[in-house]
């Protein structure tokens, strides 16, 4: 079939909770992709974690067949369900590169949110034809006309032919399918040209080995053919090709314009670089397709097993997750306080939480997580440049020329009654206002903020100030020089490397006092006095003392000479002095996490 006019490849883009996965469910149901008895909510969110949190983490693909009412032809629709959260923007960019058009789903009661904007701009950059869809028009609070105007004002899309639907009840789903067929362009490609297929995603299946998700641009991928990975130069014979309906369905071949999966008995996903081009080993394509820009981990934290004998299990588990999620990185590290573990890099905080939860769930591990930090650039006096992932490793200030930290461009959309508090929060976090515009009763503020300031609990604070109405999206902009210092935390005069952090000099004293105060409440009392100190270099900037537990050694003295009591008390004093010298202070796991939260709410 060299005619590609019957194929439509499209993605669904939306903010979290605007009904993207529900719409995908309805499209699958309407096109008969799944029998009624197999139908379940969020059909494409295959991970338990995705279903529980109601978010999409991995992009999924489905092939559907739809007979158009307008011309009676049967069309092949390839749907990519994409994540909506800012941390998974990388997954979104890959999905968009594999499609020619998108459905933009906007909640008719809530309107355009910050992440809708980010994903729409990505789709426009990818050259997509975009169909606006207003979801949840059956809600009493829905205001379709106002939201249409907002889409035109904020994004600049024509909404005169936007489709109003209710994904929950299935209202007007057929109109969405008609719009897909009539308004989206078919893919371009030549079946007879040398094979070129874009590797969109890959994951590891314990029975099948590595499953590769591809979008064929030119030529054909057939069973039995030898495929060549252009980036790595590896050659593998293809065992199976097929499509998802959403179940796996084997076919003989995948030709230009189609999406599907390929299996070739590959054991390691390291051989499958996402964004690579697959071609026929016997008649390779002259050049590779443009890939994706590599995702760069933004947030780093240490993961340590509670039981040190689990170290190897943790290593294997991380390697397995890396198979499915090429966007996170890890390297071994050791800590005096926590033993051996790994320093892991993530795309953002939600990504970090998800990976940690998957490790605990899928591999049964008990983990200690250190505070998240960002990557600082250390410019040394001898002209070298160091990238610092762990605050505990910060070099001696004498050897430092200057330090740079990453800044982000953050877009915040918020109802205007909460704007004042939101702007105050951004200023408190060293933000620089770049833009402030209004669309109806919502304001859109654009700020430059240091990533270090938002990485911890900025999102939580934003939500609590705005009663959950604000939405937030950011992209890493660039590095800028800052006056940063390392604050060490000493417990019983011993530095605890896992609690060290880097802060701006103006905030170091305040943060140090805050953390010492918290640790005083979090560390249980011992039989001797425990001093907790925060220090910059050799200068102590804050101190708290945990009082000793008192054991009443004179309880068994009834009356008699006072010197008898004094002797016992002196003996106890000597013992406590010795204990203070050699005693070990136990710091509970909860102290590591709670001590480093920025705010007290």
Curated annotation (Swiss-Prot):
The organism's place on the tree of life at top rank: Bacteria
E.C. number: 3.6.5.n1
tr-type G domain segment(s): 5-188
Location within or outside the cell: Cell inner membrane
GO cellular component, one term: plasma membrane
Gene3D superfamilies for this protein: 3.30.70.240, Elongation factor 4, C-terminal domain (3.30.70.2570), Elongation Factor G (Translational Gtpase), domain 3 (3.30.70.870), P-loop containing nucleotide triphosphate hydrolases (3.40.50.300), Translation factors (2.40.30.10)
UniProt cross-references to SUPFAM superfamilies, sorted A to Z: EF-G C-terminal domain-like, P-loop containing nucleoside triphosphate hydrolases, Translation proteins
InterPro entries in alphabetical order: EF-4, EFG_III/V, EFG_V-like, G_TR_CS, LepA_C_sf, LepA_CTD, LepA_IV, P-loop_NTPase
Reactions catalysed, as given in the entry: GTP + H2O = GDP + phosphate + H(+)
Membrane-protein topology: Peripheral membrane protein
Alphabetized GO MF terms: GTP binding; GTPase activity; ribosome binding; translation elongation factor activity
GO biological processes: positive regulation of translation
Similarity-based family: Belongs to the TRAFAC class translation factor GTPase superfamily. Classic translation factor GTPase family. LepA subfamily.
Official protein name in the record: Elongation factor 4
Gene expressing this chain: lepA
């Amino acid at each position: 079939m060299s005619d590609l006019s019957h194929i439509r490849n499209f993605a669904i883009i939306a903010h979290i909770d605007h009904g993207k996965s529900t719409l995908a469910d309805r499209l699958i149901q309407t096109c008969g992709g799944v029998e009624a008895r197999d139908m379940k909510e969020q059909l494409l969110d295959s991970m338990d974690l995705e279903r529980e949190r109601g978010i999409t983490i991995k992009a999924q693909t489905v092939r559907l067949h739809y007979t158009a009412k307008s011309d009676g032809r049967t069309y092949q629709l390839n749907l990519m369900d994409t994540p909506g959260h800012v941390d998974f923007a990388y997954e979104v960019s890959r999905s968009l590169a594999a499609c020619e058009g998108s459905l933009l789903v906007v909640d008719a009661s809530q309107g355009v949110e910050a992440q809708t904007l980010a994903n729409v701009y990505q789709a426009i950059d990818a050259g997509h034809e975009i169909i606006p869809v207003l979801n949840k028009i059956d809600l009493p609070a829905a205001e379709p006309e106002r939201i249409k105007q907002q889409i035109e004002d904020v994004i600049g899309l024509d909404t005169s032919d936007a489709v109003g639907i209710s994904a929950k009840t299935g209202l007007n789903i057929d109109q969405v399918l008609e719009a897909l067929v009539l308004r989206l362009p078919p893919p371009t490609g030549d079946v007879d040209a040398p094979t070129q297929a874009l590797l969109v995603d890959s994951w590891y299946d314990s029975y099948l080995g590595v499953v590769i998700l591809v979008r064929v641009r030119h030529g054909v991928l057939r069973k039995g053919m030898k495929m060549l990975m252009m980036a790595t130069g590896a050659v593998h014979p293809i065992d199976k090709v097929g499509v998802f309906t959403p179940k796996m369905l084997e076919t003989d071949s995948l030709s230009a314009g189609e999406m599907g999966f390929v299996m070739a008995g590959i054991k390691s996903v390291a051989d499958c670089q996402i964004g690579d081009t697959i071609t026929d080993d016997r008649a390779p394509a002259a050049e590779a397709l443009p890939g994706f820009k590599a995702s760069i981990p933004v947030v780093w934290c240490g993961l340590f097993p509670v039981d040190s004998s689990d170290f190897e299990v943790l290593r294997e588990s991380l390697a397995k997750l890396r198979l499915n999620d090429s966007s996170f990185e890890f390297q071994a590290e050791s800590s005096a306080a926590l033993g051996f573990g790994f320093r892991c890099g993530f795309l953002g905080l939600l990504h970090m939480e998800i990976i940690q939860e998957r490790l605990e769930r899928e591999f049964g591990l008990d983990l200690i997580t250190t505070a998240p930090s960002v990557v600082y650039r250390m410019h040394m006096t001898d002209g070298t440049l160091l990238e610092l992932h762990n605050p505990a490793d910060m070099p001696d200030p004498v050897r430092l020329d200057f330090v740079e930290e990453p800044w982000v461009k953050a877009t915040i959309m918020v109802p205007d009654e909460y704007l004042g508090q939101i702007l105050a929060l951004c200023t408190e976090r060293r933000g620089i206002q770049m833009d402030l515009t209004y669309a109806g009763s919502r304001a859109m503020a654009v700020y430059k903020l240091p990533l270090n300031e938002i990485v911890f609990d900025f999102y939580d604070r934003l939500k609590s100030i705005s009663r959950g109405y604000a939405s937030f999206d950011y992209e890493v902009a660039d590095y800028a020089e800052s006056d940063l210092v390392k604050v060490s935390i000493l417990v019983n005069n011993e530095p605890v490397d896992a609690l060290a952090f880097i802060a701006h000099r103006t905030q170091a004293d305040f943060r140090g006092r805050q953390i010492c105060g918290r640790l005083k409440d979090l560390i249980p009392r011992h039989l001797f006095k425990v001093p907790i100190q925060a220090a910059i270099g050799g200068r102590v900037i804050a101190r708290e003392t945990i009082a000793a537990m008192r054991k009443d050694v004179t309880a068994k003295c009834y009356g008699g000479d006072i010197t008898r009591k004094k002797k016992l008390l002196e003996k106890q004093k000597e013992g406590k002095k010795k204990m203070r010298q050699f005693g070990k202070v136990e710091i509970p796991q909860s102290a590591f996490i709670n001590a480093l939260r920025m705010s007290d709410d």
